[in-house]
């Protein structure tokens, strides 16, 4: 069975609708919302063929259809229209990247923040190792009555996260109190300074939350000592929680587990060192933890030499054309800004 123009239009419509709504798509929906010029019955026949070709599939609990990983791949390779950033987005990028950022780490974190902000996905980047790392902040995000995600950020942009067990009696307000106190007393300190001066004080102040405090300090230690080699930058962690796919706690744990394994992330991001945009969809990713996700990455360069990689991680139900446009633009801007910065600093 061959793909023809009508099948392509039906597949395109299914993907557009599913990306937009996160709901399985039926033939009546396509007939009503997309002007394909054919009846729901004809669309049903085409959907049956698309399912036979492996391009769409039926979720267990629904009569509608959703794209398969193969369907997304066909869309990206054959149907996707290239997009560019709109004028306001371009102004935002150029304004942010033209700020007088002196440190490479600041430039990398700014880039990662922009990637996440412009796409609403989670942004990752690998950059040169510069400077001495200090603790910046910790945040807790309750995900179950007895579990919370703890996220630690360092001055280098390194981010560590773990799902922590918390006492059943501990409220979100209690978690907020812990994070505020840790941030107020530890921000800007190295791990040696943390150990030397403040652990006893914090232990006294947070007697009732000792279990959470102990695990938090372990996580801070990992973050401050996990930046050997290329530094790993991450932004848009909260965007993960907005995606319906990751309301499944197991999927969420798998993804968060990968994001905290910086060496694994380095390997995943270095799969394609050659120039250009690279897209890996679902099962194309070689690590189990990201097989429910898609990754859009590109390397940035200095005089033809690869400096590092930036990219996005999101559900396979991703706006690929938007993701590609943002990664392309920021790769170009980052290469230009780092060229000036690294030459001046002699790195």
Curated annotation (Swiss-Prot):
Keywords: Repressor, Stress response, Transcription, Transcription regulation. GO terms for biological process: negative regulation of DNA-templated transcription. The keyword Repressor applies. InterPro entries: GAF-like_dom_sf (IPR029016), HrcA (IPR002571), HrcA_C (IPR021153), WH-like_DNA-bd_sf (IPR036388), WH_DNA-bd_sf (IPR036390), WHTH_HrcA_DNA-bd (IPR005104), WHTH_transcript_rep_HrcA_IDD (IPR023120). Pfam families: HrcA, HrcA_DNA-bdg. GO terms for molecular function: DNA binding. The keyword Repressor applies. NCBIfam families: hrcA (TIGR00331). Negative regulator of class I heat shock genes (grpE-dnaK-dnaJ and groELS operons). Prevents heat-shock induction of these operons. Belongs to the HrcA family. This is Heat-inducible transcription repressor HrcA. It comes from Heliobacterium modesticaldum (strain ATCC 51547 / Ice1).
């Amino acid at each position: 069975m061959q793909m023809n123009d009508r099948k392509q239009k039906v597949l395109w419509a299914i993907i557009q609708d599913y990306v937009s709504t996160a709901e399985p798509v039926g033939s009546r929906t396509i007939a009503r919302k997309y002007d394909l010029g054919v009846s729901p019955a004809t669309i049903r026949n085409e959907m049956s063929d698309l399912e036979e070709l492996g391009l769409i599939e039926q979720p267990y609990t629904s009569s509608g259809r959703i794209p398969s990983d193969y369907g997304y791949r066909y869309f990206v390779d054959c149907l996707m229209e290239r997009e560019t950033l709109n004028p306001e987005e371009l102004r935002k990028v150029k304004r942010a990247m033209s700020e007088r950022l002196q440190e490479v780490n600041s430039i990398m974190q700014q880039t990662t923040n922009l990637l996440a902000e412009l796409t609403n996905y989670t942004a990752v980047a690998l950059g040169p190792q510069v400077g001495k790392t200090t603790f910046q902040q910790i945040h807790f995000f309750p995900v179950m009555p007895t579990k919370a995600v703890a996220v630690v950020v360092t001055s280098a942009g390194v981010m560590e996260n773990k799902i922590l067990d918390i006492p059943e009696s501990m409220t979100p307000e209690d978690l907020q109190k812990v994070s505020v106190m840790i941030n107020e007393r530890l921000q800007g300190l190295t791990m040696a300074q943390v150990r030397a001066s403040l652990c006893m004080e914090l232990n006294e102040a947070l007697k009732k939350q000792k279990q959470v405090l102990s695990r938090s300090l372990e996580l801070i230690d990992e973050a401050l000592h996990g930046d050997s080699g290329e530094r790993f930058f991450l932004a848009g962690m909260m965007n993960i929680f907005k995606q319906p796919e990751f309301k499944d706690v197991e999927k969420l744990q798998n993804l968060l587990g990968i994001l905290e394994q910086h060496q694994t992330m380095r390997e995943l991001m270095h799969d394609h060192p050659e120039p250009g945009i690279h897209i890996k969809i679902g099962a194309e990713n070689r690590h189990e933890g990201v097989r429910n996700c898609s990754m859009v990455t590109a390397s940035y360069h200095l005089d033809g030499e690869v400096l590092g990689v930036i990219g996005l991680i999101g559900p396979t139900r991703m706006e690929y054309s938007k993701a590609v446009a943002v990664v392309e633009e920021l790769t170009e801007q980052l290469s230009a800004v780092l060229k000036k910065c690294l030459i001046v600093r002699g790195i």
